[in-house]
């Protein structure tokens, strides 16, 4: 209706796994929980993020254990359906953790950032998938590699239809989820990267690393999680 909001999250079970999805409707009358849905892969990690497509009709679940699962979403009922994998873990394919995903404005491409994790991983990647390909996982195309101490972070579609990517400078061994240990500023963490034409193929998407200046500030692994205020009603 262009007024209410859906809040969606997957349940995390310590020392176990769960396929439970919780959906809440936020309206002027309050917050109401919808029936719990059992759908998709049972995840065993709390390193999981959810991202809606620009139209709100699709939802991507990014599992840090190298799974990407795509769902259809009914904006009127809050019901998820049609789960299918964009990527399933293959030991020989990628190292590191899957960190963040984002749709292109036309919803034909999906972008993924991975972060290095562990002593044997020194590369973080920006990757594109073609959601219209007969075999989506086989369409995986690496756009750019970041080498330690530089790591990728969060992907976010902006109101200008460009996709922004934060970076993290891991130079002080403060731990994976912590802020910098010092006050040193570097070009690599004072600028974020930009995909200027994300509807295009990987070769033509015009990715420019470290190209958007943050006005003297530093970035980390994350970006703001802003809702899409321009979505409007379906009818």
Language-model features, listed with the residues they occupy:
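Beta-propeller fold recognition
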Residues: 1-73, 77-86, 93-235
């Amino acid at each position: 209706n262009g007024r209410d909001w859906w809040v969606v999250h997957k349940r995390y079970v310590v020392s176990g796994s769960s396929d439970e999805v919780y959906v809440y409707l936020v309206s002027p009358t309050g917050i109401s929980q919808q029936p719990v849905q059992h759908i998709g892969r049972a995840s065993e990690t709390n390193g999981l993020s959810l991202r809606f497509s620009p139209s709100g009709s699709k939802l991507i679940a990014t599992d840090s254990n190298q799974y990407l699962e795509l769902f259809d979403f009914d904006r009127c009922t809050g019901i998820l359906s049609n789960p299918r994998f964009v990527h399933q873990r293959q030991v020989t394919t990628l190292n590191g953790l899957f960190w963040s995903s984002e749709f292109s404005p036309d919803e034909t491409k999906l972008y993924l950032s991975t972060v290095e994790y562990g002593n044997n991983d020194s590369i973080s990647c920006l990757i594109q998938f073609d959601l219209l390909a007969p075999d989506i996982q086989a369409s995986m195309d690496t756009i750019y590699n970041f080498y330690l101490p530089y790591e990728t972070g969060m992907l976010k579609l902006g109101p200008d239809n460009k996709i922004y990517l934060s970076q993290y400078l891991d130079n002080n061994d403060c731990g994976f989820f912590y802020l910098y240990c010092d006050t040193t500023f570097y070009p690599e963490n004072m600028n974020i990267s930009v995909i200027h034409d994300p509807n295009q193929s990987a070769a033509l998407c015009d990715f420019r690393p470290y190209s958007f200046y943050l006005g003297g500030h530093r970035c980390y692994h994350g970006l703001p999680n802003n809702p899409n205020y321009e979505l409007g009603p379906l009818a």
